[in-house]
Amino acid sequence: MFNEITKSVTWNGKVLELSTGKIARQADGAVTVKMGNSVLLCTAVVAKKAKEGIGFFPLTINYREMAYATGKIPGGFFKREGKASDREVLVSRLIDRPIRPLFHPAFVNETHVTCSVLSYDPETPVDILAIIGASAALSLSPAPYLEIVAASKVGLINGEFVLNPTLELLKTSQLDLVVAGTSDSVMMVESEAHLLAEEQMLEAVKFGFESFQPVIKIIKELAEEAKKPKLEMQDLYPASLKKEIEKLFVKEIEQAFAIKSKQERSTNLDLIPEKVLTHFVSDIENKKYSNYQIESALKSIESDILRNEILEKNRRIDGRSTTDIRQIACEIGLLPSAHGSALFTRGETQSLVSTTFGTSLDEQIVDSLEGEYKERFMLNYIFPPYSVNEAMPMKAPSRREVGHGKLAWRAINPILPNKVQFPYSIRVVAETTESNGSSSMATVCGSSLALMYAGVPIKAPVAGIAMGLVKEGKKFAVLSDILGDEDYFGDMDFKVAGTSEGITALQMDIKISGVDFKIMTVALEQARLGRLHILEQMNKVISKPNSELSKNAPSTTTIKIDKDKIRDIIGPGGKVIKEICETSGAKIDISDDGSVSVYASDRDKLKVALDKIKAIAVEPEIGEIFNGTVMKVLDSGAFINYLGNKDGFVHISEISEERIETVSSVLKQGDIVKVKLIGFDNKGKAKLTIKNADKDKSSNNPKPKNNVNNAKENSEPERRDSSKKRAWNEDSNNDKEEAITERKYFN
């Protein structure tokens, strides 16, 4: 019944198996990928008719993670998989980027690739398997897929490169890099790194590239045995058509490209296609040429003009040389109510960035195949239509926005302080207010500025730069800080972010074959110099984190209590903790280890909540002084309420140094008095005294007994007086039981 074909290879000590002919047999291409206990089904379907006139290749990649792959039922009301998660979007883009450039340029048939995770093994990288499976499925389909792609993941642990590291190993790795390519070229790189040198990054790419070559071999073997006839493709347009357009309109195109302003240049270029189509109207009616052929030939001429100017004259659209960076302007603190803000402008690309602090309750909950976890740092990239002067409605975040946001997240995440050093959750929102190339790298620069202005103790400022490439034969030019048109007509989009010491994120997309490691070496070094120049400009505005947080930032502190007291703070049905939150206006987060984090909008609210928690969780010591309230007056003494919910008795002899006739002559119900704990009776009731209590230092925050885990407190990060210009010190609070500081703007 089944004509199953299987190919396998031992890869990094595990068997990688590709098979076809058993599942999804009606799809143009279908491959089951197995490694360990991970199983993926990857399919490719090609539309029978071309979709001409759309101006782009209609390729859609969908990566899906099925809940049953880990033996789970999806949450939510409908109990089924729904909208793609950010993780699924990111892996879909990861598959798309190395594959898209490898189709015949004239191929415009709608093509759908679906990669479904059917069984999940945390010891295997399913994103890598998805790229391999998608490439294999396309190689079996009729699509004119010109070369076969494979991929690998590279980690760096204890100075050694590790192929396809497990999730557990990645936690200790200095590098998380995905590289994809063909048998002779790298096509795509995506990475997050902990301040690695350019040489290390290049070596990691080489290591990954060499590692996936055996995988390409078995995909080729599978394709040879099971492939279907490929669609026959013609040239995108006749060479004679291009020559005729060039003869008639090249001067006008060159004049338009000579305009430095993006808007004016685009306006002039947009007028040309209509003139060209009008000239060839009779040929279109006679079906000698199609609109799509004419527009494609025109685009090719535009590309030739731009590329020749760069390669032959070392001159770019805006007049810069290949290494020049556009003019940079930085501004901080322009949004008074935000916790931190910055405006970063580089030429005609601009990003408005804000930083907001939250509590651990504001952390993003992520439900993935690995299980549920919380993300403390969130970065949202927004690309509104007005940034490129388009009249379009605002929509939900696109795949591009999710991808650009994640790249910026990778660039910033390695330099953030840990939760002990900085207990807040952090959200950064970067809105691209103008765009003419490299908006994701403007996001990185703006985010670094906004975080420093907000007072986040980052390890070092971070900047990002987008590099381009124009290559004809053996001649090539690497471009620093590319424009939108240079990205569109160029051969590479190479984004590098990092500090002055090393790289934190790298993303590379190559549109052509033949980009070797020599070109990549030149690009990395040129990017390093550009990054240092941008950092120099940023440092003129702010070079280190402010020493104080915004006055709008929440105050926070963390205390450690006995685990047995957690239930008392929560109360039946959460009654007690709700009452504390409602009366104080604070937020409280309790961990299983007895850590209690309290967040409030100001110092007073924080203190109210903290006092209430201590009243429940902390036992007073003999000799401690408290403010107490007289609850009931008797002939023999008075009952006093102190430390929230605790009661004690003051005997008449302990009320005053002088003899008194009656208790009521000195104390009345509701009176506020200072009392000292002097012991406990045989029933465990507290014995208090008022005598001389007001002469001692009072405390409503007693030091807990040793049997309460010493109730150690870790205060919110203290900021020194900015006028003293003292540096951040993560250990500055170790000698303090409690430190709650008001936050003020840094001037």
Curated annotation (Swiss-Prot):
Report domain S1 motif positions: 623-691
Q: Which NCBIfam families match?
A: polynuc_phos (TIGR03591), PRK11824.1 (NF008805)
Show the ranges annotated as biased composition (Low complexity): 699-712
Query: Where, in this chain's numbering, is Mg(2+) bound?
Result: D487, D493
Against PROSITE patterns, the record matches this protein to: KH_TYPE_1 (PS50084), S1 (PS50126)
Q: What is this protein called?
A: Polyribonucleotide nucleotidyltransferase
Note down the stretches annotated as region Disordered.
691-747
Q: Which organism is it from?
A: Rickettsia felis (strain ATCC VR-1525 / URRWXCal2)
Reactions performed catalytically: RNA(n+1) + phosphate = RNA(n) + a ribonucleoside 5'-diphosphate
Q: Where is the composition biased (Basic and acidic residues)?
A: 727-747
Question: Which co-factors does it depend on?
Answer: Mg(2+)
Organism classification, top ranks?
Bacteria, Pseudomonadati, Pseudomonadota, Alphaproteobacteria, Rickettsiales
Q: Where, subcellularly, is it found?
A: Cytoplasm
